[in-house]
Amino acid sequence: MRDADGKDISGAGIRRRFLEFYEARDHARLPSSSLVPEDPTVLLTIAGMLQFKPVFMGQEERKVPTATTTQKCVRTNDIENVGVTARHHTFFEMLGNFSFGDYFKKEAIAWAWEISTKEYGLDASRIWISVFREDDEAYAIWRDEIGIPENRIKRMDEADNFWAAGPTGPCGPCSELYWDFHPERGVDGSEDLDDDSRFIEFYNLVFMESVRDTDGNMKPLKRKNIDTGMGLERMAQILQGKPNNYETDLIRPIIDAAASMAGISYDDADDATKLKLKVIGDHTRAVCYLISDGVLPSNVGRGYIVRRLLRRVVRCGRLLGVKAPDGAGAFTPAIARVAIGLSEACDANVLKSSQKICDELEREELRFATTLGRGEEILADMLAAAKTKDANAPKLTGEDAFTLYDTYGFPLDITTDVATEAGVDVDVDGFEKAMAAARDLSRDARVAVDVTVGDLLGAIADELGEPTRFTGYGSVTEEGVKVRALLKGGERVASAGAGDTVEVVLDATPFYAEGGGQVGDEGEIILSDDRGKLVVGDCRKAAGGRLFVHSCVVSEGVVGEGDAVTATVSAASRRRAKANHTATHLLQSALKMTIGEDVSQAGSLVNFERLRFDFNAPSAPTPEELARVESLVNGWIGDAIDLTAEEMAISRAKEKGATAMFGEKYGDVVRVVDVPGVSMELCGGTHVKNTAEIGGFKILSESGIAAGVRRIEAVSGPGVVDLLQERDGTVKALAGSLRVPPEEIAGRVSALMEDLKTSQKEAEALRGELAVAKATALASQAIDAPGGAKVLVARMDGVDPAALKAAAESLVAALGDDVAVVLGSGGDDGKVGLVASFTEGVQKAGGLKAGVVLGATAKACGGGGGGKPGFAQAGGRDASALDAALEDAKKTIVDALSK
């Protein structure tokens, strides 16, 4: 791609020529930094200067005096504008030249002008300049040395043309170069260079010349710096003569690939179709570079940005009918290969990572396709319900949005996109509240031990000398043990009676104390001769692990220090805990075998109901991988493998290859739990003797909880039976309510949904017919305005917006050629519906516009809205103001027609 002078104006050529221009002026060409910045305060690399920020801030010494780069950047703050405007992107390249205490303002301006007009050949008469209002030096250089006429140099305020790293630190004025797409318009109306249809900023020069202190005072920098940025996509648009950045050779090939896979032509497409193709082109570039830099799809941080962008690509592709080349599977990898092919001159690592990128895209797309199909149908019903509830200002509740997210995995941003397209608002605040409430419910309720109690228990341990002896590996009952200490309300007591909540220390116990992710045992402590009983709800370690402390309620009798007791763990609870704990070990091994040896534990919870396992993984397991994990665990359960547990030196355990538990600290002697051929871990928890005792294993859910951290929740043993019984009960209850066999439930529900939709449509049609009938009765109330026009302004309560529209249309048809109709409806809830319909004759005769008249009426009713000159709809929140508002509307119309 070359211009009239034979110069390369392709995206690659523009990039190469920029770098070579500054290399010829003694700038060191440096590589682009990663999209994952070293600066912990920034999520993604958003500017070319970011890799040099420590130098500009005086935190690092410069390695070179001057530099030039092409920096890959990602910004998502304007994601909703992608494809809408000519130049908004998520991914873009920023060409830059930098000076670290070397050259300054005069050279930076001269070179910016030279590369723009000489190297790139831009028409000097079409370049406009902005400077900071107080930067007389830059103004003079542009005017006197470069020769820019004063009427093409604009002084801007601090908000537009002054850069600062923060409230304190380096700062300085900016100067920007703008390209004029329409010089024929002259200088009028261009005072602020803010007409996006005419001007585009393509080069920004930052002159870091001051440092601001905490009092806001600015002093000159000892070493002045230059930071510049030229948008590659913008310069390509200018040089290639394209109407927008998307049609340059940097993005258009990606768009054309998507269009071809959808069987359409971009050039022949309507605006809505072009918008979706632009989103695909832009977002595909972004996700390719992000994944290449190690950012994988997840629900947190940078990973969520990748997931969000990719899901927008998938949804746009589905709406356009984009198909994979082979007609099946994921389509995103094929489009990504085009973007990857365009990447080499910007970042060669993208091409090297092509297989990784395509694998991630395919995995994520296929997972999301299932979610999208299920969620779209449910969301459609929710949006229809929202419109039925309030047609004037329909809003999807936060609870519904959260249900879509929590139950069906439908992300909020996609919900918002779909709702916006349907004209429905989303209660985002309500969604966040529902999310917070769910987190509160799921958070483990653990009461922190008061510091004073901890000190007291430490003193008790010192007094007793011997630590609590744990006997729970071999038995769930220990007879003849003694009560060594009693605590009540944080204080040591000699005895406690029925109803008291106490903490009990025994000299020996079968109760497992919480640790290694496993909860403490529950059970009971019985006094000798059955003189009393304590119900144990938990057991924990205290005093540096020397004491086992039992949390109890005295249910019968009186217990005192020195009493002989029998401690018994609940056999049912222990059985569940053992099954879940051993299943956790099997789960980790299955994950390593299925996903890879790089999988490592990041946390766990084993209780009596279920197990939770957190693990590090670069990406989410696929449904097929989870199915294999589940199958492996159940296979080992079926193999009836005997477990062994042995204490040994930690050095020997490491030699044997035992895996350590996450977050645990170990002494010189450790306990190793071995499932031969499957798993070997350092673990102090309780386990089954044979895998067959687990009974069964079922994954309940898998999700992301942090960047690169996944969570699996599952049940085993009796928990599987509980799950099956619960689901069986639900199925039977549904079958009973629907009066069909269980296997016919799905079909019956689908039929009922279709019946409901049909009934709703019929009801809507009847409401429309009723409104038209009411309107016929109102026709006689029309008044004759000057000029022969008919004016009818009336109230029709109890009518929804759709029916109100039908009524207005029928009245216009019935009353003649020159008609103005305004109808209002007030409900018991205080809300107002409004509609206006003006014929063309009324519009011309009175200069009336339905949207303007109705907008004022709606405003008087505490609402808003509008429409076209001939037809408009609106709503309000104050039905008490409706009568007066309608009278004002009538007066406005009649007065206009009287002129």
Swiss-Prot record:
Cofactor stoichiometry and binding remark: Binds 1 zinc ion per subunit.
Top-level taxon of the source organism: Eukaryota
Single GO MF descriptor: aminoacyl-tRNA deacylase activity
Catalytic activity: tRNA(Ala) + L-alanine + ATP = L-alanyl-tRNA(Ala) + AMP + diphosphate
InterPro entries: aa-tRNA-synth_II/BPL/LPL (IPR045864), Ala-tRNA-lgiase_IIc (IPR002318), Ala-tRNA-ligase_IIc_anticod-bd (IPR018162), Ala-tRNA-synth_IIc_core (IPR018165), Ala-tRNA-synth_IIc_N (IPR018164), Ala-tRNA_ligase (IPR050058), Ala_tRNA_ligase_euk/bac (IPR023033), Ala_tRNA_synth_plant (IPR027522)
Principal subcellular localisation of the protein: plastid
SUPFAM superfamilies in UniProt: Class II aaRS and biotin synthetases, Putative anticodon-binding domain of alanyl-tRNA synthetase (AlaRS), ThrRS/AlaRS common domain, Translation proteins
Pfam annotation, one family: tRNA-synt_2c
Binding site for Zn(2+): H581, H585, C683, H687
Any GO BP: alanyl-tRNA aminoacylation
Keywords for the protein's UniProt record, in alphabetical order: Aminoacyl-tRNA synthetase, ATP-binding, Chloroplast, Ligase, Metal-binding, Mitochondrion, Nucleotide-binding, Plastid, Protein biosynthesis, RNA-binding, Transit peptide, tRNA-binding, Zinc
EC number(s) on file: 6.1.1.7
GO cellular component: chloroplast; cytosol; mitochondrion
Subcellular location: Plastid, Chloroplast; Mitochondrion
UniProt key word ATP-binding: yes
Cofactor: Zn(2+)
Domain remark from Swiss-Prot or TrEMBL: Consists of three domains; the N-terminal catalytic domain, the editing domain and the C-terminal C-Ala domain. The editing domain removes incorrectly charged amino acids, while the C-Ala domain, along with tRNA(Ala), serves as a bridge to cooperatively bring together the editing and aminoacylation centers thus stimulating deacylation of misacylated tRNAs.
Its job: Catalyzes the attachment of alanine to tRNA(Ala) in a two-step reaction: alanine is first activated by ATP to form Ala-AMP and then transferred to the acceptor end of tRNA(Ala). Also edits incorrectly charged tRNA(Ala) via its editing domain.
Family: Belongs to the class-II aminoacyl-tRNA synthetase family.
Subunit field text: Monomer.
Name of protein: Alanine--tRNA ligase, chloroplastic/mitochondrial
Native source species: Micromonas pusilla (strain CCMP1545)
